[in-house]
Curated annotation (Swiss-Prot):
HAMAP family: Ribosomal_uS5_B (MF_01307_B). GO terms for cellular component: small ribosomal subunit. This is Small ribosomal subunit protein uS5. NCBIfam families: rpsE_bact (TIGR01021). Keywords: Ribonucleoprotein, Ribosomal protein, RNA-binding, rRNA-binding.
């Protein structure tokens, strides 16, 4: 099976969402009569203000697969609480054999992250973050691990509510 790693492409549609295609794989199904070729596309969509979603689409042709992936990503969007263009706190994410470490960074640091993780942060609108991946570098697993870490983000107000304290007590 051949694999095509597509260049990350960005799109800005009229709905204000940022779209990035992370990868397109050529897949093959072997049947009695021969091989059936198809394509699988992986995309991320975000609003530049903390909302992000991932989608995977499969079809016989690339444009159809990408369109399906974009639509699925739009349906799967969720909000991540950001603080001044970076994350609230350091967090680990895991999916399959991929593990990622996501850490907030000071202003001026930029997005220090590899491939698929960078695409997620770009569409989300994160300006400063440090991310490190361990284990599998499969784009699908890396994106899922990154989103797992982002879902674990919590604000000081969330933590204060869980502990039954005020935000001032939590922040010291």
């Amino acid at each position: 099976m051949a694999k095509m790693q597509a260049k990350v492409q960005a799109d800005e549609r009229d709905d204000g969402l940022r779209e990035k295609m992370i990868s397109v794989n050529r897949v093959t199904k072997v049947v009695k009569g021969g091989r059936i070729l198809g394509f699988a596309a992986l995309t991320v969509v975000g609003d530049g203000d903390g909302r992000v979603g991932m989608g995977k689409g499969k079809a016989k042709e690339v444009p159809v697969a990408v369109q399906k992936a974009m639509e699925q990503a739009r349906r799967n969007m969720f909000k991540v609480p950001l603080k001044n263009g970076t994350l609230q706190h350091e967090v680990h994410g895991k999916h399959g054999a991929s593990t990622v470490l996501l850490a907030p960074a000071k202003d001026g640091t930029g997005v220090i992250a590899g491939g698929p993780m960078r695409a997620v942060f770009d569409v989300m609108g994160v300006q400063n973050v440090v991310a490190k991946s361990h284990g599998s570098t499969n784009p699908y697993n890396l994106v899922r691990a990154t989103l797992d870490g982002l879902r674990k983000q919590s604000t000081p107000a969330d933590i204060a509510a869980k502990r039954g304290k005020s935000v001032e007590d939590i922040l010291g």
